Every structure is written in C-alpha cells, then in structure tokens.
A protein has these predicted regions:
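Conserved histidines in hydrophobic membrane contexts and catalytic metal-binding motifs
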Residues: 30
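Short hydrophobic/aromatic beta-strand micro-patches
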Residues: 48-50
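N-terminal beta1-alpha1 ligand-phosphate binding loop
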Residues: 33
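Catalytic core of pol beta-like nucleotidyltransferases
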Residues: 1-27, 36-41, 52-102
Length: 102
C-alpha cells in the first residue's frame, strides 16, 4: 500500500511499483535529500528496498538500472542489510516509508 501523498515520492513509488511482485518487495523507504525535501536537480535518490526473494547481484543491478531509466535520475539502491552499521540507525531514523506490504 502506497503511504505518501507527496508527488515527488509518488513518482519514486510508481517507478518501483512494477517490480514489487516480481522481487517480493515488502517495503520501500527514501532517505537523504529527497526525504528531507532538500533535493536539487543534481541530487540522486537514496532508496532502501526490503526484498523478500533471493536475487543475485546482476538482478539487483538490473532493478537499479530499470528504476533509474524510469525516473531519468541516478539512484542509490540499498537493501537494509547492506547499510553501513555506523550510519544505519541514522539512515533508518530519517527514512520515509513510501510503500509497505499489508
């Protein structure tokens, strides 16, 4: 279920929506400048996806490239377990959940 009314974040959700079932995505969160509303035209989008299915690195890279092509913007795509431990708590505290499986 999409959890945002912010048009910027809806656009990100819509770019990922086609892959939710294919990859078993249970949650999508945005952090960084987009989450704070401080993005510039040059900003990338920082996205955390909880993926329920086992996928290889090439599938993950393909997912990232497909989202970038749809948004016409660079993204940084993370799974929660790949966030650096020393900043993970800070990232998760500021992250905005834009989709959560119900």
């Amino acid at each position: 279920m999409m959890l945002t009314k912010d048009s910027r974040l809806k656009k990100v959700y819509k770019a990922i929506e086609p892959f939710i079932e294919e990859f078993g995505i249970s949650q999508i969160r945005i952090f960084g400048s987009y989450a704070r509303g401080e993005e510039t035209p040059q900003s990338d989008i920082d996205i955390i996806v909880d993926i329920g299915k086992q996928i290889g690195i090439y599938q993950f890279i393909g997912l990232k490239q497909d989202i970038e092509a749809t948004l016409n913007k660079n993204i940084d795509l993370f799974k929660p377990n790949t966030l650096e431990a020393f900043i993970k708590d800070q990232i998760l505290a500021e992250a905005i959940t834009i989709y959560e499986q119900r």
